[in-house]
Amino acid sequence: MLLCSLTLTLLWMVASGLECDVKEVCLGSPGIPGTPGSHGLPGRDGRDGIKGDPGPPGPMGPPGGMPGLPGRDGMTGAPGLPGERGEKGEPGERGPPGFPAYLDEELQGTLHEIRHQVLQSQGVLRLQGSVLAVGEKVFSTNGQSVNFDAIKELCARVGGHIAAPRSPEENEAIVSIVKKYNTYAYLGLVEGPTAGDFYYLDGAPVNYTNWYPGEPRGRGKEKCVEIYTDGQWNDKNCLQYRLAICEF
């Protein structure tokens, strides 16, 4: 019985102390706030916001390094005003020789018409024997005797050339004029770079000759050709005075 009373007393004491502890924890006044804690870890990035308005242009930066590649050519502009006339340039180089006149069909047609007109307008001279027509050629003289260069200039001035026979018939026509004036005449032939080789004035090689036996023998010193009253040829220097006979 004593043991029972002691047990009850202990139980009551335990029960009483427990009630007191509970009251101190649950029913006491708030304590002093604690110190702030340290910052936590950064949170995740938020979503992109709405695009803002463009800002004002910034100042021009310094020049870059190497220049860029050239751009494409622009469109052609309007023509400018004509410039002043420049000074006359130096003469150009001599061009290559042209084709001989006898190979130009159009030129031959023109010459044929000229010959026809000459024959019609020079009828009086033809009666005097100063104009002779042979085939497609017309030979004429004014009766004057001058040197080779003067004859060449005279014939060119009237639209012709120094008479140059290319057949026996043409040679005989020239002889008839030479006999009429009882003198010699220069022919339209000149010696080339090689002694003894003669050419027409247009540069074509001679295709008909009637040299006096042993001629030519000037050995490059006699560059021109004269025709005798018998129709034979002789090489001669170009400074002698001979009858001027032109061909058209």
UniProtKB/Swiss-Prot annotation:
Keywords attached to this entry: Calcium, Collagen, Disulfide bond, Extracellular matrix, Gaseous exchange, Glycoprotein, Hydroxylation, Lectin, Metal-binding, Repeat, Secreted, Signal, Surface film
Main location, first listed in the record: secreted
Chain sites annotated for binding Ca(2+): E215, R217, N234, D235
GO molecular function: carbohydrate binding; metal ion binding
Location(s) in or outside the cell: Secreted; Secreted, Extracellular space, Extracellular matrix; Secreted, Extracellular space, Surface film
Domain C-type lectin, chain residue ranges per copy: 132-248
Collagen-like domain boundaries: 28-100
Biased composition regions of type Low complexity, renumbered to the chain: 69-82
Note: Pulmonary surfactant consists of 90% lipid and 10% protein. There are 4 surfactant-associated proteins: 2 collagenous, carbohydrate-binding glycoproteins (SP-A and SP-D) and 2 small hydrophobic proteins (SP-B and SP-C).
Family: Belongs to the SFTPA family.
Protein's name according to its UniProt entry: Pulmonary surfactant-associated protein A
Annotated organism of origin: Bos taurus
